[in-house]
């Protein structure tokens, strides 16, 4: 299984959301990349997939929406180990279920505090590391 990198990619078509989220993550010393569109996000992932450990992904974006980006990440052998948290204002059960079906590793509402965002990111990354350790032990 390929190892994932150390960067977090923030994808949102609202620059203020990107900047605020990036500021919160950088306060905790996370290395970030940013994108304002689905197209740009896919290009960044293609060019930097070995460096990216997590994508915070908005669902509602013009042209290529977050679901399409998620599907392309999870269906590509090179990228599928990258963790994806859908980060959106959409709070309908349908959206949560669709995200899970497409392989999302988590779901966050944008009306979240910086502390709650950081706590959730830490939890997702910690859970993933524990899963990796279990997998390594099973292979021994």
Regions found by a protein language model. Give the residues of each.
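Short, glycine/charged-rich "phosphate-handling" switch motifs in NTP-dependent
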Residues: 105
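Charged docking surfaces used in two-component/phosphorelay signaling
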Residues: 19-27
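Acidic, metal-coordinating helix/loop segments flanking the phosphotransfer/catalytic sites
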Residues: 34-54
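C-terminal output helix
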Residues: 112-121
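CheY-like receiver
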Residues: 129-140
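Receiver (REC) domain active-site loop signature in two-component systems and cognate sites
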Residues: 61
